């Protein structure tokens, strides 16, 4: 696992955007695993700028999102479908729609949807670069503490800490969905390369645990120690004291 400590969130985000852009330029059929949330917004901003400036061909690029809330239509303002459209797919509208994959959290049969997405990942993968955030409790994707390391795409119950952390995106905490469809930990580890980002003082403890804990289901992110190609980008506020 390689740690990269940069001065600011913007600088780290730019570096990661450059890595994604280089991958797209070198491998036109690349497969990207995408994440959402405040951590990722600047990454997509810089990636859109790079793609636009270079008039990049993304027609063969395929994207796979980590997760989606249960109970929200794709058109809902707080769905991850809407987020991805706002920050990337509408900003650079040259991705083929049939190459954009996001779980359907509004499916009538969530278990079947998880199975469908899992099959899609197996058939179209492996993902070349998977980007990840990390929760304050050490979750990646929506894989909360205690998640089986062998888990594949599944329906998860969100912890109270995750619900509280995500409530800032909703009118009130009661509106935050209590479940999500998420790639499992085993699914994430199938990616050829993983880039995790963490910014701000609230992520400092999670990064410290990632670095110092043994591999344990109590801190899902520690499973990344078993992967041969992981980079962790942090800003000064999230960097543990040992860095």
From Swiss-Prot:
Q: Which UniProt keywords apply?
A: Carbohydrate metabolism, Hydrolase
Give the Gene3D superfamilies listed for this entry: 3.40.50.1360
Q: In which pathway does it act?
A: Amino-sugar metabolism; N-acetylneuraminate degradation; D-fructose 6-phosphate from N-acetylneuraminate: step 5/5
List, in alphabetical order, the Gene Ontology terms for molecular function in this entry.
glucosamine-6-phosphate deaminase activity; identical protein binding
Q: Name one GO biological process term.
A: N-acetylneuraminate catabolic process
The portions of this protein that span the membrane are: none
SUPFAM superfamilies associated with the record: NagB/RpiA/CoA transferase-like
EC id: 3.5.99.6
Name the source's superkingdom: Bacteria
Q: Which reaction does it catalyse?
A: alpha-D-glucosamine 6-phosphate + H2O = beta-D-fructose 6-phosphate + NH4(+)
Which HAMAP family does the protein's record reference? GlcN6P_deamin
Similarity section: Belongs to the glucosamine/galactosamine-6-phosphate isomerase family. NagB subfamily.
Q: What PANTHER family does this protein's entry cite? A: GLUCOSAMINE-6-PHOSPHATE ISOMERASE
Entry function:
Catalyzes the reversible isomerization-deamination of glucosamine 6-phosphate (GlcN6P) to form fructose 6-phosphate (Fru6P) and ammonium ion.
Query: Mind telling me what this protein is named?
Result: Glucosamine-6-phosphate deaminase
Q: Which organism is it from?
A: Staphylococcus epidermidis (strain ATCC 35984 / DSM 28319 / BCRC 17069 / CCUG 31568 / BM 3577 / RP62A)
Taxonomic lineage is:
Bacteria, Bacillati, Bacillota, Bacilli, Bacillales
